[in-house]
């Protein structure tokens, strides 16, 4: 008999709507003992079967659902099916957009909670972010090896959220060769170098692919400021769009060095690209005080909010930095601003930009809205999957 998680009376509604999380407050009791990440059955207070998921006693998310089908076992065949389903959509996208790199598995939205897999050429980069994902590591890797024999697998499960699930951080090769120090990938006509072993996340922000392309329509013969530039994806796209100058700002000299290499790799005019190592908040104030002006500003900061207790502080941070950007824009200039914080809704982010414009003493028009690229889908029953949002704003 399997271990069962019994829900408190009336707490089954979200599961009936196929939401994949069960929070600790919804649990009445456990029937049997389960180890960290082990597969359990989830039942309502009367014992009616609802779902099968992974148990995580150390997390506020007490269980994550693998399947709502009572006949489905969680084994190698299960992961093979899920991977094949996800691959169909990525194959279409890759062919349509000329990609050799994309997000293969987007966690809950691909029916594999706590699992992220990015493909960069013939390297699969794996992040196991939940206890259940870690528990099923061997089955998942076996399925990957069968479906992708040409690919090496590299683990980047060096993410702090694992500690909340009672797990250590892990990183290193799983199968095949080590990735090179910098791996070239292709994106909308650009060649970009990715540091799989030491870069942010899995090495590169694939979720901003379509936003980088959209930037090109605004930049011809314009002076562009690229804030939190990382390895220069927006800068390369701006140069391909015909900008007169792009200034990339980041605190990491290593990232700026790769950004410079990316400009050279694409045979673009390096004299139009400037790379500044500095704190963005500080530099924006310096630019304002000395009267610098730009035609287009890209504002793509790291996540400002990790939990609800940080939300108010994050709102202030987003408002301040966007206010400074708006002050630096010429009349008719365009601000492309983003938030990758899952707790920041699109409506709240839009209000923050409006408040920033008021504080800057400028009017803005919202002219375009952005979200994560199409290889980062959001399943309808899990709206939390929509974490990246952005706006193009015309400053009057």
Curated annotation (Swiss-Prot):
It is an enzyme of class 2 (transferase). GO terms for molecular function: RNA binding; rRNA (cytosine) methyltransferase activity. Keywords: Cytoplasm, Methyltransferase, RNA-binding, rRNA processing, S-adenosyl-L-methionine, Transferase. It holds the Pfam family PUA_3. CDD domains: AdoMet_MTases, PUA_RlmI, RlmI_M_like. Signal peptide: none annotated. It comes from the Bacteria. Residues 2-81 form the PUA domain. It catalyses: cytidine(1962) in 23S rRNA + S-adenosyl-L-methionine = 5-methylcytidine(1962) in 23S rRNA + S-adenosyl-L-homocysteine + H(+). GO terms for cellular component: cytoplasm. Specifically methylates the cytosine at position 1962 (m5C1962) of 23S rRNA. PANTHER family: RIBOSOMAL RNA LARGE SUBUNIT METHYLTRANSFERASE, S-ADENOSYLMETHIONINE-DEPENDENT METHYLTRANSFERASE DOMAIN-CONTAINING PROTEIN. HAMAP family: 23SrRNA_methyltr_I (MF_01857). This is Ribosomal RNA large subunit methyltransferase I. It comes from Escherichia coli (strain SMS-3-5 / SECEC). The gene is rlmI.
